[in-house]
Curated annotation (Swiss-Prot):
Role, per record: Required for the assembly and/or stability of the 40S ribosomal subunit. Required for the processing of the 20S rRNA-precursor to mature 18S rRNA in a late step of the maturation of 40S ribosomal subunits.
Gene3D superfamilies to which the protein is assigned, alphabetical: Glucose-6-phosphate isomerase like protein, domain 1
CDD domains: RPS2
GO molecular function: structural constituent of ribosome
Family label: Belongs to the universal ribosomal protein uS2 family.
Keyword Ribonucleoprotein: yes
Descriptive protein name: Small ribosomal subunit protein uS2
Any single Pfam family the record assigns to this protein: Ribosomal_S2
Amino acid sequence: MAPSNLPPVFNATSQDIEMLLAAQCHLGSKNLQVHMEPYLWKTRPDGINVINIGKTWEKIVLAARIIAAIDNPADVAVISARPYGQRAVLKFASHTGATAIAGRFTPGNFTNYITRSFKEPRLIIVTDPRTDAQAIKEASYVNIPVIALCDTDSPTEFVDVAIPTNNKGRHAIGLVWWLLAREVLRLRGTLATRETEWDVVVDLYFYRDPEAEETKEIADETKVAGAEEVGPAAIESGYVGDSWDAAAPGAAAPGAAFAAASATAGATWEAEASGDWAAESAQPNPETKW
């Protein structure tokens, strides 16, 4: 599924297309914004709008070329108020040198020069035009170009480059940011050739729930020893394999020990019982004198 509007060198590989499909980047919402119609491929019977993956790749390459054209990487601001995109923008910033704004966008970041967090970027990239509306609005006041990850129902007002994709799933958001970072590094020459594999795995860009990770660690620590952990312990204690009848080294056989003990006990009982009980009972008790 190679886009026809790109030079052959920029065409997506089959692996890139498979990753976009596996992350469900092509699944939009049931609502359709009029400006997103050119990126629509079809509408499923259940009402889900399907995005054209070829258009998604074209816009990723276009956005990467815009980012690579900026001399100072720190002049690019990547923004995500949506939790699923915060880890992705932080990783993108660390790999490309951009400035990350993860979490709540403080009003006045681009317009109020008195605030400590005042910034003057030359380009901003947002994860969702709806949740990052404040950043887009302020960028329009100071003439900052905007690149946005847009779903089929996303508002495109003041958005200069829209990357059509699913911007609600954590895998879709992480994958698009990862592809964008890889393409920027290719254009800058950090990656020698387009055939060179990037050693950063896409999983680093995916959102991870801290509470779920903590619960998993606690479960691993309190894990009860399984059957596979009993075997080595039994071998170390002197028992070989699963045979419970085998004696430990230096110990006598259980049957022989029981027979010897029984023989000794029988001889002793017979010796004690040889006395005359009648003679003992006939003896008168001595009188007690007070």
